[in-house]
A protein has these predicted regions:
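Intrinsic-disorder/low-complexity signal
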Residues: 1-222
Length: 222
């Protein structure tokens, strides 16, 4: 049986992984081309000062995975500052810093998180994948941006174009994996998370923002 890719829409019905032949090592990824933007707001004003650097800023998009138990209490966060969980069932492949600069770069995903579902701890019930802009630039401005979810055989089984992201959104909950009756379900909250760059806020505050937003989305769905 051939396996097709799918474009997902906001608040689509959850997909059971077993029914869509996704198994083994799952992959959440993002790809985009190198994008340089002029400084905005206060940064633009400061750039006009003598000896200040007024060069455009290259977009740096970061992919993170927030792991929750059944009651939506956070038990782990995988991001560029913590590349894997204790049993290595979730692994971040590293921080790309900028988008693809060459044809060869464009053939790979700039950031990727791999998940081995059969090795996840029993306490892990929900995995929320968040894409954020390190320099607080709107995600949608990244050239040829695409978000993917799949497995090693078909890493782009599901994909979302950055064109579907709200114009001013800087951080977005893009994928949600949840245990359901012995299976795993994939959904796409497309929930705007109000975050600034990770280095400027504690991980606890970032996690609280993600948790609050996802819980609001969950209540809206049901």
């Amino acid at each position: 049986m051939s396996r097709k890719t799918h474009v997902l829409k906001e608040y689509f019905d959850p997909v059971k992984l077993s029914e869509h032949q996704l198994d083994g090592t799952l992959i959440a990824g993002v790809s985009y081309h190198f994008t340089s933007l002029e400084k905005q707001g206060l940064a633009a004003l400061l750039a006009k000062l003598p000896l200040a650097d007024d060069a455009p800023v290259a977009m740096d998009l970061d992919l993170s995975c927030f792991v929750y138990d059944k009651g939506f209490n956070v038990i782990d966060v995988i991001w560029y500052g913590n590349l894997r969980n204790a049993d290595e069932s979730i692994r971040h492949q590293g921080d790309a810093l900028v988008g693809a600069k060459s044809f060869e770069d464009s053939l790979i995903q700039q950031e990727q998180i791999q998940i081995k579902l059969d090795q996840l701890p029993d306490t892990a019930h929900h995995l929320i994948f968040v894409l954020s802009s390190y320099h607080n630039q709107p995600l949608r401005k990244a050239q040829k941006g695409m978000i993917y979810f799949g497995d090693k055989e078909l890493p782009k089984a599901y994909h979302i174009s950055f064109d579907q992201i709200e114009p001013d959104c800087q951080s977005l909950a893009i994928w949600q994996l949840s245990r359901y009756r012995g299976d795993w379900e994939l959904s796409s909250p497309m929930a705007d998370i109000k975050l600034t760059k990770l280095s400027n806020k504690s991980l606890d505050k970032i996690t609280d923002a993600v948790t609050t937003r996802i819980q609001a989305v969950q209540s809206k769905r049901w």
